[in-house]
Amino acid sequence: MSCVSKKQLMLDMTKKELRQQIKQLKSMTPLAVRQVEADMVFNTIKTMPVWLQAQHILCYWSLPDELPTHESVNNWLAEGKSIYLPRVKGDDLEIVPYHGAESLDDNNKFHIGEPVGDAVDSSCLELIIVPAVALDQNRNRLGRGKGFYDRLLSSTSCPTIGVACEFQLVDEVPVEPHDHPLDCVVTSDAIITDEEKRYLFMAQ
């Protein structure tokens, strides 16, 4: 086995171990607690300059083990924001307008509620809110390992915010050369920003 493949194997093992640790912590955290944390996270985001300026926002329709978004997404839609959700197409994510929970379809490979309708170009987005298995102090993100968000984020330059419960914020997430940190990380107890883009996320 080459040095490169050995290094990759060790990295994959470390990512797998971290995902397993977070999974155990999630199983010990009631949904009601995660909902309280979600309310705190999204209330924080709604005070940020980037949120106040953005009209077209990509979020995610949360799975049972993710920071809950259903209530917030519906509230934002009612408040007049243009909300978009991801839809899996092959190895990539399409960006589709969200018109309400009744328009979602979970008849797909991952049984995720996905919006129906025509996809739009990601260039219309002004803010992306990203789920994570784990986030770290350097704004690195660990996902589920499929690479969907990695590919999406590499194709857009709009501001990105990673959100998670407090226990999902760790000292260090294993990264690879092609990984790029998010612009901002928000938990119920922390805001971590790129200093050069701090003006987008911190009220002056």
Model feature map: region roles:
Residues 91-204:
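Conserved phosphate- and dinucleotide-binding cores of soluble alpha/beta proteins
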Residues 9-123:
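N-terminal active-site beta-alpha-beta segment that forms phosphate/nucleotide-binding
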